[in-house]
Structures are given as C-alpha cells and as structure tokens.
Amino acid sequence: MKTLTIRQPDDWHLHLRDGSVLQAVAEHSAAHFARAIIMPNLVPPVVTTRDAAAYRERILAALSEGSAFTPLMTLYLTESSCADDIEAGFRSGLIKAVKLYPAGATTNSQSGVRNIEAVYPVLERMAKIGLPLCVHGEVTDPAVDIFDREAVFIERVLQPLRRRLPELRIVMEHVTTKDGVDFALSQDENVGATITTHHLIINRNAILAGGIRPHYYCLPVAKRESHRLALRAAAISGEGRFFLGTDSAPHLDPLKECACGCAGVFNAPNTMACLAHVFEEEGALDRLEAFTSLNGPAFYRLPPNEKRITLRRYDEPLEMERKVSVGDEAITVFDPMFPIHWKVED
C-alpha cells in the first residue's frame, strides 16, 4: 500500500453556488482544500465588495462548525464596475481577484463584458495595485466554432491585452487547448493558468461518442485528444505558471439531463483521488504537490499551507460517491471512467 504526503492543496477556481446547492456542496471542497477562489457568477452576480462580503458569510455559514476552509472572494467584472470599490475590496484583504466573463460565454455570464475597451479603466487600476484578473478565455462570436473559441480569444483579446497592459496579472482559467498552454509558456511571470481535473481526463469523445453524456459537458468544452495530452504535460511539468483550478460546477441533475442542459462538471468530491491517479499514470507523483499546493499560492502571493494531507493507494478499487443529495434532487459526481484506488486519509 502506497502513501503520498503533501501540503494541503488549494482550489484556484471553484463554483459553490448559493442556497440549497451551496449547503449541499461546500463541505465536499472543504474536506480536502484549505482555500479556494470562489467564482462570482451567481444570480444576481457578485459585483461589489459588499456583495462579496455577504456571499462569504453565506459560504462560512454552510460549513461545519470548526471548519478551517477559507473562501477567497472575487468580483464579477461588468462594464459599470467601480474601480474605487474594487480597490477598496482588495486593500481590505477581502477581494483576491476580479473575474472577466465575456457576455454569454458560460453559466450566468449575461452580465459580463461585451466591449473590452469599456473596462480598461478598471483593468488599469488593477494593474497598478497588483490585483489579478481571472479570465474565462472564450470568444462568443457565433461565427467561431465552439472548439476554436479559446484559440481565437487568445488572438483577439488576450494578446492585445498583454501588449497594452503587460503589468496586469492574468490567470488564464481552465485552459483546454495546446494553444492556451503554449501562450501561457510564452509569457512572463504575470500570466498563470489553471487546469481542471476533468480536462486532464476526458476529451470530446467522452461527451459525444456513443451517445450524449451531459455530465461531461462543460465550458470551455473538452477538446480533441492532442489538447488533453498537452494539458497533462503542462500539469505534470512542475512549471510554476500551471496550477489546479477544479472548476467544480454543480448543477442539479434535471438541469443537466434535458434538451438544453447546463454546462458544468461537479468534481469536488473526488478531485484529489483522480489527480493522484493521473500523476501516477504519468510517473509524476513527485510533482502533484507543486500543481495542487505550491504553484497557485506563489502566483497569488500567498504562503503555501502548513498543514499536510496524506493520500493512500489501495490495491482494490474504492467505492466512489456517485450522487450528492440536494433535498429531493441530486447532483451527479464526475465519473473519471477508471477505477479509483486513491483516497485522502481522514
């Protein structure tokens, strides 16, 4: 029986939702992760520092008594966002990043940015104070194929943004393509990139081959196998600009299993077990800690966690949690399509 002890990991891209779903899922992240960057795409979105403070209180109230989990709050960038409010939130220690959603790119992004020029005054302030911009990197131009939207975003939006504001610290969130990996590698230390658990495991065949599988549908959508392999190479490389952002995104099953299903994969309960499998498969268990526990804090200029966790590998496959109940309904947990042998020890 094999064990691996690492610093406690963090999740640099997490959806906890609100209300009954928040109550049902929060502990699944808190069980393994010390901190998480919390996405602000609620309805209505988390736009102001006051909104973020209130949401943080709701998250803390959803955790078990004595939980040490720390939600790291973000603001949703709109064309009417107030630079002074954002700076005040950052100076107070509450706000750790601002999230750019191109309008219509993903779940609850209708209030996002349609014209990047309109938010440059805010971006300039963020660059000045050192506040990171987390970017959902897809164009929403209907003429662009869904599988090309990340590459086109890099060309149309990210490259001009980098030229105009090279001092702005940017996180390319949930990169899904070799184009994204290569762009991140070509940039200086002001650019980092998160990679999700599921994009290391599935390609687009998982969604489309042999029938529609809605629980593998997410945005950005999984791409072809060559891109998945590029993501794996980046994640296991030890390169400091790549770090874990699970993009765990719960939706109730009826909202996934329908004619027009929601995008999102709920992987919080089994992420660390899945990642241990991936890194073991790649002969890179010695670099799992860098990806999950060291690179993200370094980019966000936070200390790594002092606490350690131990992962244990069992000879026989372990039973995996399949569903999380939310009242009379349920959320399906990500199925990696391989037997789970690793477990975070209590």
Curated annotation (Swiss-Prot):
Give the UniProt entry's GO cellular component terms: cytosol
User: Where are the N6-carboxylysine residues found in this chain?
Assistant: K99
Can you state which reaction this protein catalyses? (S)-dihydroorotate + H2O = N-carbamoyl-L-aspartate + H(+)
Give the annotated active site.
D247
Q: Which cofactor does it need?
A: Zn(2+)
- Which top EC class is given? hydrolase
Write down the CDD domains for this protein, in alphabetical order.
DHOase
Output this protein's name.
Dihydroorotase
Question: Could you tell me which species this protein originates from?
Answer: Chelativorans sp. (strain BNC1)
Gene symbol here is pyrC
